[in-house]
């Protein structure tokens, strides 16, 4: 599964809300620009990637959502043969607007991606996907 999903640049191939992605590189410092079906654009920078441990970490350098300090991690944890767990987490600060609404928008993005992964790659019995998100308090 890491071969399919572990590339920092692969998100447009499997995430249903991403309509386009531009970027290149798989080393820290690589960037990707995402366009979403609701018209938003995100620019993200890879901060760490470890193929042996099957994870990468990234940060948003530009977003049209009122957020700051966005740091995400995408990890595939190998389980028993032919099983794995995808763990996709993020931390961010909501800078303005309704904190719950903004957090719900990010959560919906993660949820859509997790469901797409499950639909495309899970074999009976269904592989468990975990989604966790922590929203930091708004800056004053």
Model-identified regions with their sequence ranges:
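Hydrophobic ligand-binding cavity/cleft-lining segments
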Residues: 1-25, 138
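Generic low-complexity, intrinsically disordered sequence content enriched
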Residues: 9, 38, 50, 133, ...
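Hydrophobic-ligand binding "helix-grip"
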Residues: 12-13, 20-23, 27, 36-85, ...
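Short active-site oxyanion
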Residues: 31
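A conserved amphipathic terminal alpha-helix motif
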Residues: 85, 91-140
């Amino acid at each position: 599964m890491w071969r399919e999903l572990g590339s920092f640049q692969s998100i447009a191939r499997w995430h249903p809300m991403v309509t386009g992605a531009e970027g290149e590189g798989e080393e820290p410092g690589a960037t990707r620009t995402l366009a979403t079906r609701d018209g938003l654009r995100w620019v993200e920078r890879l901060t760490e990637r470890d193929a042996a441990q099957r994870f990468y970490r990234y940060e948003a350098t530009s977003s049209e959502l009122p957020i700051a300090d966005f740091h995400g991690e995408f990890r595939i944890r190998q389980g028993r043969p032919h099983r794995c767990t995808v763990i996709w987490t993020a931390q961010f600060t909501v800078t303005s607007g309704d904190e719950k609404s903004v957090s719900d928008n990010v959560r919906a993005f993660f949820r859509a991606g997790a469901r797409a992964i499950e639909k495309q790659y899970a074999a009976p019995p269904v592989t468990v996907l975990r989604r966790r998100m922590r929203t930091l308090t708004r800056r004053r």
